[in-house]
């Protein structure tokens, strides 16, 4: 093989590797397209038997509302949008492993934000619940989640690990899963992870 052919061969493989790596940095929806921060999506369990899409669920009182899954299998739930902590001014694709806000696109009688937020520990399981509302603490790190790739292509986990929103904070990161309590499917950290997919509205 000539030096020129070898150079072209190597450059072609480097380009292919860079293109594959670049695509892998983005969250992909159920249609195979990158998830965008200015679009609406439904978050659905990737595995049947976990309930329907993500939705607002009442807890012990009317407010704050919890983040959960619809009890009816196959339902879409409530649409969300994603707002990156550090948006890329040149594109609107949602990136893997980057802090972002998740916001339900609906109004509530609670008169509060529908941003996902890390809540208190569940009294029974000790797992940290996901609720809605603004975190009024310094840096609002309770409102920042991230999407991470699972080992199965096209499925993802959602984690609370706000290392961009608060790089100096010492936090106990956790992956979102489900607690079944009083006939409700509540999202919480610190247990079995819930693999999800993102379906564009």
Curated annotation (Swiss-Prot):
From the UniProt annotation, give the residues forming the signal peptide.
Answer: 1-24
Q: What induces it?
A: Accumulates in roots during colonization by arbuscular mycorrhizal (AM) fungi (e.g. Rhizophagus irregularis and Glomus intraradices).
| Localisation per UniProt entry | Secreted; Secreted, Extracellular space, Apoplast
GO molecular function term, any single one: serine-type endopeptidase inhibitor activity
- GO terms, biological process: arbuscular mycorrhizal association; response to symbiotic fungus
Subunit info?
Answer: Interacts with CP.
**Can you name this protein?**
Kunitz type trypsin inhibitor 104
The organism is: Medicago truncatula (Barrel medic)
Organism lineage reads as: Eukaryota, Viridiplantae, Streptophyta, Embryophyta, Tracheophyta
């Amino acid at each position: 093989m000539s030096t020129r052919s070898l150079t072209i061969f190597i450059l072609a493989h480097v380009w292919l590797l860079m293109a594959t790596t670049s695509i892998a940095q983005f969250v992909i929806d159920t249609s195979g397209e990158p998830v965008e921060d200015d679009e609406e999506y439904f978050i659905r369990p990737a595995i049947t038997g976990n309930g329907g899409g993500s939705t607002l669920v009442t807890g012990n009182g009317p407010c704050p509302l919890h983040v959960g899954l619809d009890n009816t299998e196959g339902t879409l739930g409530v649409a969300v949008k994603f707002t990156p902590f550090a948006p890329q001014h040149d594109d609107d694709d949602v990136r893997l492993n980057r802090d972002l806000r998740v916001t339900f696109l609906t109004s509530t009688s609670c008169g509060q934000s529908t941003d996902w937020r890390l809540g208190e520990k569940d009294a029974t399981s000790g797992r940290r619940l996901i609720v809605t509302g603004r975190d009024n603490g310094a840096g609002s790190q309770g409102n920042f989640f991230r999407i991470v790739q699972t080992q199965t292509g096209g499925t993802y986990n959602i984690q609370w690990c706000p290392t961009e929103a608060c790089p100096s904070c010492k936090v106990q990161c956790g992956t979102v899963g489900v607690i079944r309590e009083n006939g409700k499917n509540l999202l919480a950290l610190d247990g079995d992870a819930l693999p999800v997919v993102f379906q564009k509205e």
